[in-house]
């Protein structure tokens, strides 16, 4: 098992001194990947994308509300945008929990895996809902005065 861990971390069959420690550096191939750091960066990137989509949906909601009930797809768009915003807030909260828990604690692996799967499913639903929002269209009619 120890040799397997050494092999995974790049310490087996090295040409230099067998007792030498792996180089410590940001881009070194010999340093093991810090999974907690990687997961935190991944979750932060997902959160930034979630914030961008949240802002886009808020803008779409504002436009639909300005168009008023006379707009042909008023109720469906209000419903879809509200669903999308709610799901995005839930995803954001779940991502905060995922980032806060220590990935190296094996007792938390099951719950972290479950949360990751839930977040993935919710993000898929958000994407599908936003496809329908785009299909219905949220553009203001052109004000042509002639």
From Swiss-Prot:
Membrane topology, Cytoplasmic segments: 101-110
Annotated spans, Helix alpha2: 55-71
GO biological process, one term: killing of cells of another organism
Any Gene Ontology CC annotation: synaptic membrane
Keyword Acyltransferase recorded: no
Role noted for this protein: Effector of various programmed cell death, such as pyroptosis and necroptosis, which mediates plasma membrane rupture (cytolysis). Oligomerizes in response to death stimuli and forms ring-like structures on the plasma membrane: acts by cutting and shedding membrane disks, like a cookie cutter, leading to membrane damage and loss that cannot be repaired by the cell. Plasma membrane rupture leads to release intracellular molecules named damage-associated molecular patterns (DAMPs) that propagate the inflammatory response.
Subunit structure, interactors included: Homooligomer; in response to death stimuli, homooligomerizes into long, highly branched filaments and large, ring-shaped structures in the membrane.
Protein name: Ninjurin-1
């Amino acid at each position: 098992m120890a040799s397997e861990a050494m092999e995974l971390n790049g310490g087996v069959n090295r040409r230099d001194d067998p007792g030498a420690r792996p180089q410590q550096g940001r881009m070194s191939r010999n340093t093991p990947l810090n999974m907690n750091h990687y997961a935190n960066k991944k979750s932060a990137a997902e959160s930034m994308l979630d914030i961008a989509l949240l802002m886009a949906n808020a803008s779409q909601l504002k436009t639909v509300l300005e168009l008023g009930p006379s707009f042909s797809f008023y109720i469906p768009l209000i419903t879809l945008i509200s669903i999308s915003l709610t799901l995005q807030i839930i995803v954001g909260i779940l991502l905060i929990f995922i980032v806060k828990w220590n990935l190296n604690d094996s007792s938390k692996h099951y719950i972290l895996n479950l949360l990751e799967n839930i977040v993935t499913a919710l993000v898929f639903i958000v994407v599908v809902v936003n496809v329908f929002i785009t299909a219905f269209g949220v553009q203001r009619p052109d004000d042509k005065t002639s």
